[in-house]
Amino acid sequence: MSDSTPVRAPRHPGIYLLPNLFTTGAMFAGFYAIVVSIGGRFTDAAIAVFVAALLDGMDGRVARLTNTQSEFGVQYDSLSDLVSFGLAPSLVMYNWSLSSLREYGPLWGKVGWAAAFIYAVSAALRLARFNTQVAVIDKRYFQGLPSPAAAAVCMSFVWSMDNFGVSGPALDMFTPVTAVVVGLLMVSRFRYYSFKSLPMGDKVPFLWIIVGVLILVPFFVDPPRVLLVVFSLYLLSGPIVTLWGLTTHRKRQRRGVI
């Protein structure tokens, strides 16, 4: 090869289009939630975060069904989750309620944005921890409240209150507590059931159909309040399951000693 022969740069590998379109859609929904919340459309913002959660749940399944999993997709999905379930809920809550704390004085104003930041950084830490432990943790459980579920708790709360006609400023003392508690649950060590071991492709007892109908009918009648109840129960399940497991383990240890 002569000195004058041009050297071709190595070609960069492409990315899979279909699953990453779902991921992009989820990120756009989170971004949209932030934008419309600035304009005071809080119900639309909350619904957008739920749309993001739906798309986020589909991108991984699409990748597995089409055999298009990639490390790029994993990292891109994580960044999308940070926008949709970290930044979007924190800023929606800030625009809806937390920003009104500044009316009590400069210090209270800082409490408002600090609560929003604690939620956002907790989501970031939760996602980073998940990415580093995904190969070693028990697939049946999540460690800490998953960020989509945390976002669902907060956004169903905003959605329900907005439907009731309750303004964010009327709850400006409750919202920061909610944001901080939910944020801390994301980085906690409480175990939350992942539902990954459910037999989705297998036959199930007929009773499961009845249970599904009993859940779906109220959901279509009053979506925000049903979502708030369901995800609040899931939020509480982590501490309850973890403490129950510790209590049972200690009882077994005592029996073994005796």
Give residue spans per PLM region.
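Multi-pass membrane catalytic core of lipid/isoprenoid biosynthesis enzymes
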Residues: L18-T23, F50, L65-L127, F157
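Hydrophobic alpha-helical transmembrane segments of polytopic
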Residues: F22-G25, A45-V49, G112-S122, A150, ...
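Active-site His/Glu-centered metal-binding helix of metallohydrolases
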Residues: F28, L54, M58, V62, ...
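C-terminal membrane-associated helical module and adjoining short loops/tails
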Residues: M1-V7, K139-I258
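Topogenic membrane-insertion module of multi-pass membrane proteins
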Residues: M1-G57, V241, I258
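Helix-coil boundary and interhelical linker segments in multi-pass alpha-helical membrane proteins
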Residues: Y32-I47, P89-A114, F157-F174, F220-R225
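Hydrophobic, well-structured mid-protein blocks that either form specific transmembrane helices
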Residues: W113-V153
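Short juxtamembrane and helix-loop transition motifs at transmembrane-helix boundaries
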Residues: S4-G14, I38-D44, Q69, Y104-W113, ...
